[in-house]
Amino acid sequence: MAEITSAKAMARTVRVSPRKTRLVLDLIRGKNVADAIAILKFTPNKAARVIEKTLNSAIANAENNFGLEKANLVVSETFANEGPTMKRFRPRAKGSASPINKRTTHVTVVVSEK
């Protein structure tokens, strides 16, 4: 049986737009996990907090479930898929209303050994 060299973590239905989340994910894809955490710490973005927690979860999964070394881990895959959209309405002039879409995101982070 082949040895497992990667671990995954997901954050589902996060109240951040997928488009804004992808901008942050592009910064850490392919980086060493220590560098990725440092980048996320200094990124002034709501999505960065969520991605940092998900990345730490993936690292913990790799260490505890598969016995991988944190020093050897790289962020191999990251993606943000669209979750369910909460539809709201904003009252406007003359009794009309405009739709407001509050988007959510499913964030996935995969770490693997170099």
Curated annotation (Swiss-Prot):
Gene3D superfamilies membership: Ribosomal protein L22/L17
Segment forming the signal sequence:
none
UniProt GO molecular function:
rRNA binding; structural constituent of ribosome
The cross-references to InterPro entries, in alphabetical order and at most eight, read: Ribosomal_uL22, Ribosomal_uL22_bac/chlpt-type, Ribosomal_uL22_bac/org-type, Ribosomal_uL22_CS, Ribosomal_uL22_sf
SUPFAM superfamilies, per the entry: Ribosomal protein L22 (SSF54843)
Gene Ontology biological-process entries = translation
The record's section on Pfam families has: Ribosomal_L22
Q: Which GO terms describe its cellular component?
A: cytosolic large ribosomal subunit
Q: What are the entry keywords? A: Ribonucleoprotein, Ribosomal protein, RNA-binding, rRNA-binding
Q: What job does this protein perform? A: This protein binds specifically to 23S rRNA; its binding is stimulated by other ribosomal proteins, e.g. L4, L17, and L20. It is important during the early stages of 50S assembly. It makes multiple contacts with different domains of the 23S rRNA in the assembled 50S subunit and ribosome.
**Quaternary context:** Part of the 50S ribosomal subunit.
Q: Which family does the similarity line name?
A: Belongs to the universal ribosomal protein uL22 family.
Tell me what this protein is called. Answer: Large ribosomal subunit protein uL22
Tell me the name of the encoding gene.
rplV
